[in-house]
Amino acid sequence: MAIYLTELGDSHSFPSPYDALNDPNGLLAFGGDLNPDRILNGYHQGIFPWYGPGEPILWWSPSPRAVFDPLAFKPSKSLKKFQRKQQYKVTLNNATERVIQLCSSTRSAEETWLNEEMQTSYIELARRGHCHSVEVWHDEKLIGGLYGISVGQLFCGESMFSLKDNASKIALWYLCEHLASNQGQLIDCQVMNPHLASLGAFELERDDFVQKLLSLRDRNINLGTFEPQVLQGAVS
């Protein structure tokens, strides 16, 4: 069966997310480029780039959408016990470029979509104040983290990595605690998987997700939320 997709041109506009295909789930458009302005415009509409080696740039808006409620996130007893023992240091926006690079390099070439061009775009978005990271440290070595895009009171998670057990889980835990105390309302995780489900992610159908996005994207998060800082004290 033929698939008809919109090819993006020079304009940074996108089709409506409601035009996304059901199979493959959420595929909306192809082409264009990875200009940071285009990427940011996509996030403001619930659209993100994701494609593999040898593929054109593909743009997605899947349904259902995997999300976390930062206010409702509850770390497991075992994770709390682990962190009390290890006392990993956790920071915000202290090494965003390195986190982005490690999210790519810790995966095989076949597994990662985060190629050099994509990394360059997200690093530029970080320089502009739109892309943020959480870092987990052990003995001054970066052992885990995550990064994503802030859109008002919505945080769009992009990728995470772990070099030691539980490091990415701890990054997510501290991110949720930090957002919950600074008017962050929702974390978008794009597509559900068993790992996200085990951490408490739940799904929203497209209508519900888009309505939340529209209500949150123009709301201000607390001033200073994404200033570089240590988050270790944010978790009791």
From Swiss-Prot:
Q: What EC number(s) would the UniProt record show? A: 2.3.2.6
Task: Provide the protein's localization.
Answer: Cytoplasm
Keyword Transport tagged: no
Q: Name one GO cellular component term.
A: cytoplasm
Q: Which reaction does it catalyse?
A: N-terminal L-lysyl-[protein] + L-leucyl-tRNA(Leu) = N-terminal L-leucyl-L-lysyl-[protein] + tRNA(Leu) + H(+); N-terminal L-arginyl-[protein] + L-leucyl-tRNA(Leu) = N-terminal L-leucyl-L-arginyl-[protein] + tRNA(Leu) + H(+); L-phenylalanyl-tRNA(Phe) + an N-terminal L-alpha-aminoacyl-[protein] = an N-terminal L-phenylalanyl-L-alpha-aminoacyl-[protein] + tRNA(Phe)
Q: Assign the protein's first listed, main location to one coarse class.
A: cytoplasm
Q: Which cysteines are joined by disulfide bonds?
A: none
Q: Give one GO term, molecular function aspect.
A: leucyl-tRNA--protein transferase activity
Q: Which InterPro entries match?
A: Acyl_CoA_acyltransferase, Leu/Phe-tRNA_Trfase, Leu/Phe-tRNA_Trfase_C, Leu/Phe-tRNA_Trfase_N
Asked whether the keyword Transferase is assigned, the reply is yes
**Matching HAMAP family, A to Z?**
Leu_Phe_trans
Q: Function of this protein?
A: Functions in the N-end rule pathway of protein degradation where it conjugates Leu, Phe and, less efficiently, Met from aminoacyl-tRNAs to the N-termini of proteins containing an N-terminal arginine or lysine.
Please give the family membership noted in the entry. Answer: Belongs to the L/F-transferase family.
The protein's name is Leucyl/phenylalanyl-tRNA--protein transferase
- Which organism is this protein's natural source? Vibrio campbellii (strain ATCC BAA-1116)
The beginning of the lineage is: Bacteria, Pseudomonadati, Pseudomonadota, Gammaproteobacteria, Vibrionales
Gene that specifies this protein? aat
